Each structure stands twice: as C-alpha cells, then as structure tokens.
C-alpha cells in the first residue's frame, strides 16, 4: 500500500486492531504528557475520539491542539509487529448550527455503542455536558514494521 492509497478507513482499521493507543499532548507547563486513549469511530470522513471536559487532557488540547499518537500490538513473531504513529491537530467542533449538533450527537451515540466504558461513564447520555468529542485533522504519519526499523 502506498501513501497515496492510505485512507482514513485504513488508519481506523489499524487503530482498531491495535486496541489501545498512546496520545501525547503538551501539558500547560509546556512539557509533553503521554496517556492511553482509544480511537472511537469514523464519521464525516474524520477519526473521532472522546474525553471529559473536567480532565487535564481537555484543557491541554484546548490550549495547544496538537497531538501525536502511537499504537502497536506485539505479535508472536515480533519482527512482524506493525505499529502506527502520526501527528495531528485536534478539533472540538463548535455546536452552533443544527447540522453540527446533529453530527456531534450521532458521534457521541456511536461512541457509546462501541465502548462500554464510555457508556457507563456518561450514563448513556450523549447530552452529558462533560462528555466531549473531538476529531483529528492534518494527520501526518506512518505505518511501520519492527522488521523495517533502521538506525536503532
């Protein structure tokens, strides 16, 4: 697969296969912080994630909306282990118009259907005011394989 052939759905499939990813944000004191996250859904041609407006991660992404994400799942044949890494810009959609509000509600509902943890945390209520969704834009990165890493 060449770079020009990689689609948002290829990235989503890779993230689903990995399961848990690690996202780096810039903390308010300008230091990086890495935490586990999980990609949730593709809607409107975008990768969507979620967070809680009371968490530090939300404040960090509001102040500096640039992140890097990395994920991998070690295979039995370690040399065949694939991993994904990319940087992107975070967008919390403004819900000022009816169309965007409907999209955000659709995304939140899909996330709650996918994730038992999110369903439980927000009591299956897409209107919970602390439940925030965001998508990534300007994604740049790569799919890699441990067998092709050079220079280590």
Model regions: which residues?
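N-terminal leader/targeting segments and the immediate start of mature chains
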Residues: 1-19
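Charged, gly/pro-rich active-site loop segments
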Residues: 2, 82-152
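Charged, amphipathic alpha-helical segments
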Residues: 4-9, 54-57, 114-120
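A short, Trp-centered hydrophobic/proline-enriched beta-strand micro-motif
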Residues: 13-29, 67-71
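A generic structural signal for short beta-strands and their flanking turns/coil linkers
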Residues: 19, 35, 43-45, 63-67, ...
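Short glycine/serine/proline-enriched coil/turn segments at secondary-structure junctions
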Residues: 29-31, 77-80
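Short, surface-exposed charged micro-motifs
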Residues: 38-39, 133
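A short mixed-secondary-structure module that forms the rim of ligand-binding clefts
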Residues: 40-78
């Amino acid at each position: 697969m060449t770079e020009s052939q990689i689609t948002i759905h290829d990235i989503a499939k890779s993230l689903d296969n990995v399961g848990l990813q690690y996202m780096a944000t810039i903390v308010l004191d300008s230091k990086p912080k890495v935490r586990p996250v999980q990609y949730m859904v593709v809607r409107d041609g975008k990768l969507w994630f979620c967070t809680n407006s009371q968490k530090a991660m939300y404040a960090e992404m509001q102040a500096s909306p640039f992140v890097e994400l990395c994920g991998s799942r070690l295979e039995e044949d370690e040399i065949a282990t694939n991993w994904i890494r990319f940087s992107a810009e975070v967008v919390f959609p403004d819900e000022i118009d009816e169309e965007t509000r409907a999209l955000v509600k659709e995304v939140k509902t899909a996330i709650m259907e996918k994730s038992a943890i999110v369903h439980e945390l927000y009591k299956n209520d897409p209107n919970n005011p602390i439940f925030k969704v965001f998508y990534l834009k300007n994604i740049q990165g790569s799919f890699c394989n441990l067998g092709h890493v050079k220079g280590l």
